[in-house]
Amino acid sequence: MSRRKQAKPQHLKSDEELPPQDGASEHGVPGDGAEDADSGSESRSGSEETSVCEKCCAEFFKWADFLQHKKTCTKNPLVLIVHDDEPAPPSEDFPEPSPASSPSDRTESEVAEEVAPTEGSEVKAATKEAEPMDVEVSTDKGPPGPSVPPPPPALPPQPEPAAFSMPSTNVTLETLLSTKVAVAQFSQGARAGGTTGAGGSVGAVAIPMILEQLVALQQQQIHQLQLIEQIRSQVALMSRQPGPPLKPSASAPGTASVQLQGLTPHAALQLSAGPATASAGSGSTLPAAFDGPQHLSQPASGTSTPCSTSAAPPDSGAHPACSTGPAPGAVAAASSTVGNAVQPQNASTPPALGPGPLLSSASNLPNPLLPQTSSSSVIFPNPLVSIAATANALDPLSALMKHRKGKPPNVSVFEPKASAEDPFFKHKCRFCAKVFGSDSALQIHLRSHTGERPFKCNICGNRFSTKGNLKVHFQRHKEKYPHIQMNPYPVPEYLDNVPTCSGIPYGMSLPPEKPVTTWLDSKPVLPTVPTSVGLQLPPTVPGTHNYTDSPSITPVSRSPQRPSPASSECTSLSPGLNNTESGITVRPESPQPLLGGPSLTKAEPVSLPCTSTRTGDAPVVGGQVSGLPTSAATAVTDSACTSLGSPGLPAVSDQFKAQFPFGGLLDSMQTSETSKLQQLVENIDKKMTDPNQCVICHRVLSCQSALKMHYRTHTGERPFKCKICGRAFTTKGNLKTHFGVHRAKPPLRVQHSCPICQKKFTNAVVLQQHIRMHMGGQIPNTPLPEGLQEAMDADLPFDEKNAETLSSFDDDIDENSMEEDSELKDTASDSSKPLLSYSGSCPPSPPSVISSIAALENQMKMIDSVMNCQQLANLKSVENGSGESDRLSNDSSSAVGDLESRSAGSPALSESSSSQALSPAHSNGESFRSKSPGLGHQEDPQEIPLKTERLDSPPPGPGNGGALDLTAGHPGRPLIKEEAPFSLLFLSRERGKCASTVCGVCGKPFACKSALEIHYRSHTKERRFVCTVCRRGCSTMGNLKQHLLTHKLKELPSQVFDPNFTLGPSHSTPSLASSPAPTMIKMEVNGHSKAIALGEGPALPAGVQVPTGPQTVMSPGLAPMLAPPPRRTPKQHNCQSCGKTFSSASALQIHERTHTGEKPFGCTICGRAFTTKGNLKVHMGTHMWNNAPARRGRRLSVENPMALLGGDALKFSEMFQKDLAARAMNVDPSFWNQYAAAITNGLAMKNNEISVIQNGGIPQLPVSLGGGAIPPLGAMASGVDKARTGSSPPIVSLDKASSETGASRPFARFIEDNKEIGIN
């Protein structure tokens, strides 16, 4: 016996709805009409002779048997067993309550509707099926229609008890989109409370049981019906060849074919209605009809002969369209392939059913896929209220046709749901109980449970759960494949493994050279159609036409659904497809019109392009097939297909649209939330019109404020400035985070003392202002009363102009602020130092002496602690030149700030680099110019920041080396001034007080060592990730990627991830060591320190003469440095001693010191030497009282702190005595006078802006330091060699090792490389 899984309360309702006499009269139900009415609930639809037990769903074709069974029926049986000789027509099993059903009918209908809100319509469908011709094909079923309304009174009594007595379970079988079945559990309490009506008598608990039973059965029936209708529609569409009219049963298919134009379920119902009508004559007719179709399918399988088998009464005569009925062979093939393609066939449903049986069985059954409810039926606020709707969402077909709420106005079955309670629960997820505002939202949500990802990228094959996600993803391919259009239609996942003749998987585009629309050709299932969808047979499946790769032939008007992303697009292909006059259908770049809403269905005249892969290889020739008869409208007629060299999608003309106006459908489309969502998604294609889209990089932001902030990454604008230090930030949040730096108090509230009057200050900014007052004569150089001093300090506001200018220098700083201060990385502000500074050729200038507030802090502290330590200063006098030159270069580079990449190409910079005077006005102007967005992208590739560092004569020894001076500690060995990244030695700094993940420089704690290592790059200025476009360096890959967005790079070049541009092994230290003291050009590629040896007088793009030493080695790597760095070649630097490989020459050089024992970086305070500058910096923190969190995010560059000190030398043991003030006052007065002069000149000229840096060189300084005007830039170059010979007065004074005048020496400073501690 065959197992009939029946869950539709429709049967119960339909029996109730259908008058017993109608049921008997129509279907020849055995037994009295009343009996039929009662039992008709089960047997009414389809063939009235069948009675279904409400408890166990058993089917009985004899009323007496049915009554006998009811006496002994138990709730346990969930499956109805149908006699083998009597194939239970799905319609009978699933009749839905008719709208006119009586209260009891409504109760059952409510149950049914709760099971599936659409079931109400299904009931109508059932009634229509029982009388289907009446509803749609009135020819055969005039009487059945009327019979439906009367049954309600008779039906009520039985359905209630039976329904309420049915067992209840928490588990129901439901179809998920891409799965055969799924188990859903419902709360029984909810269900119990959900049902009302006649069931109340039985008890609240009984109703949930009934509902659950019905749901389980209905789901199974829905699957069967869906498969049946799919096959039927496929057959009607594909086998629509003119032929002898089908016999009565075939006529029904013909009828359906007419309706298939709309491809709406009701059409399928009509198709089946014919057979049902025929079967109405005799109770056994329905099984016969069912068998008949099967018979048809069997012999016809594989054949394209028209369905001539007699499966139904001459009902077909009413519909000449039956000629379009699918050929049995096509039906068989379609049933097997299409059914499989669309959804797994239910075991209960024969895969190859003839069109007749499919139609007949389906015709009796309401279309479960469409939301259908009888207006008269009541829907309870039960979790199962919209079981049918959710079932649709879970059904594989539903994935394609998900958003169809509208119903053809001419089909009463599709009346809108009348229940006011339905809307809330009808979009409730049955798995997680979430409630959604629309069916489409629910269906999308269900994919999270099913894991279905129906949308496939036709370029890379990635799958997505929503079309919106696919659209967003597809934008990645737009730049590389602008000619390939996205496939907006769902591609069943099983097709990924289906071989194609072209070798390209379904849903994937052909190679770019092939037509844009090729993805259509490879898609077997383009449309998201209702229950009956024309699905293209896979190339391997025999079809009426050779559809090797052709898209499915489904009329555009087929979808009454609202425009879900899938269905709407399938509903009407983009208008561009209409341009088939040329014989080649052109698909518009985007299927935007598909989502238009009502217009979607209106764009019916469409012919999909036929690719050469199809049979005939001929392009689709015809345009619209407007002349086709209505029957042909459902599918391309054979003649039309033959006329087209290769089968093309049918072009549906307006006349067909007139037949299926879908007025109500359009309304639902317009109001559908899904359609709105679709329109938003479609706008992605038209995002140029998006008000929140960046016009530079086309990125769409969430809101105008986000867009405004985004533009700052392109313009470099930093509107939020710190009032204390002048730093500017792109966002207020970053500024607030930065304020924490100023709020942080030094560990012991270390006070900075004024070197002139010894007044203590806790704020370096106040100290700086105080010193300015000394210099300006506002305060005498003798200690003043505290009150007066502080009053003056308060009166002197921080120079606003200075802050303004400083804001232009924060790009470099901002990056660190993002990384450390605010942990927000504003990579757009990655610093690139485009300026040339020749520190080696000139003595340190006052601006370099007091270039930053932080330097002042450190300087004052060191002055207090080692003020009289002149001996050590004398020892370091030789190195002072180079050390101070380093300081100057660092300071100058630190001031670049916003100039970094934006004004790198500014002609003004290069022009002024050699001639601009160090004036506040110029520095301000320069900084403002650099801030202008216009200059932001002017990047002169030739203007590379170069720093020449003259290797000084051999320093006395490594122990005496400049604090952070990278110049060689060995006379003959020049050192690349490469800022080596901090090593893990930081983690074990001498103090040992910091945790392993605490920054040894700024004391900032981190969660892990990797984060700490990245953070150290902010101190070392290591920027290993170099942008190949503008050569800016970034400390992290993420920052680089962010930075690349400013270049509008969609596809990141491989060179983007190059590490620091490093010299080849030939340019590494060994080669440089050959010359005793070659002039070193320090190339800062976006903050990376690159040192190369310059040949004599190399021409530099900045127009600045590069000072050259007597013996210079021209580095062939200079030219490459002017171009984007080459792609990284991993580990190209080999250690000759141990064979280890390193990625950069600097790393190799540092490593080699482990073999040589070289420690070129000596602490000038305690004499301890270190192998790396970073280690020395960390060590210097042990000598600093103000090494507080306030210095967080700042890089400490200790540049020969002792050089500043003149006067009597102090023993090391005396450095840390407490009487610093007293000792400071013991210094020769001339020292402080010179110091004041230097400060006056430096601060008065806005030393923090250091226009010298902006100008790319050191302009003439009006200040005389130590008895001589600083030579102009030109003289600097020529005087490089003279620096040590004493020919240059300022340099001579610097080189003097005597302690005659400490003022002649540059002041010791702790300077942050490329950053000024206090200001930036």
UniProtKB/Swiss-Prot annotation:
Residues 88-100, 143-160 have a biased composition (Pro residues). In adult brain, testis and kidney. In lower levels also in adult ovaries and embryonic stem cells. In embryo in developing neuroectoderm of brain, inner ear and spinal cord. Also weakly and transiently expressed in embryonic branchial arches, notochord, limb buds and heart. GO terms for biological process: forelimb morphogenesis; hindlimb morphogenesis; negative regulation of smoothened signaling pathway; olfactory bulb interneuron development; smoothened signaling pathway. It comes from the Eukaryota. Residues 1-11 have a biased composition (Basic residues). Residues 121-131 have a biased composition (Basic and acidic residues). Pfam families: zf-C2H2 (PF00096), zf-met (PF12874). One of its GO terms (cellular component) is nucleus. SUPFAM superfamilies: beta-beta-alpha zinc fingers. It is found in: Nucleus. Its main location: nucleus. PROSITE patterns: ZINC_FINGER_C2H2_1 (PS00028), ZINC_FINGER_C2H2_2 (PS50157). Residues 1-49, 84-166, 271-367, 534-623, 807-846, 878-972 are annotated as: Disordered. The modification Phosphoserine is found at S109, S932, S1197. Gene3D superfamilies: Classic Zinc Finger. Residues 295-311, 543-554, 569-583 have a biased composition (Polar residues). InterPro entries: Sal_C2H2-zinc-finger, Znf_C2H2_sf, Znf_C2H2_type. Residues 809-823 have a biased composition (Acidic residues). Residues 40-49, 271-289, 323-342, 355-367, 555-568, 834-846, 902-923 have a biased composition (Low complexity). Keywords: DNA-binding, Metal-binding, Nucleus, Phosphoprotein, Repeat, Transcription, Transcription regulation, Zinc, Zinc-finger. The keyword Secreted does not apply. GO terms for molecular function: DNA binding; zinc ion binding. The keyword Transcription regulation applies. Probable transcription factor. Belongs to the sal C2H2-type zinc-finger protein family. This is Sal-like protein 3. It comes from Mus musculus.
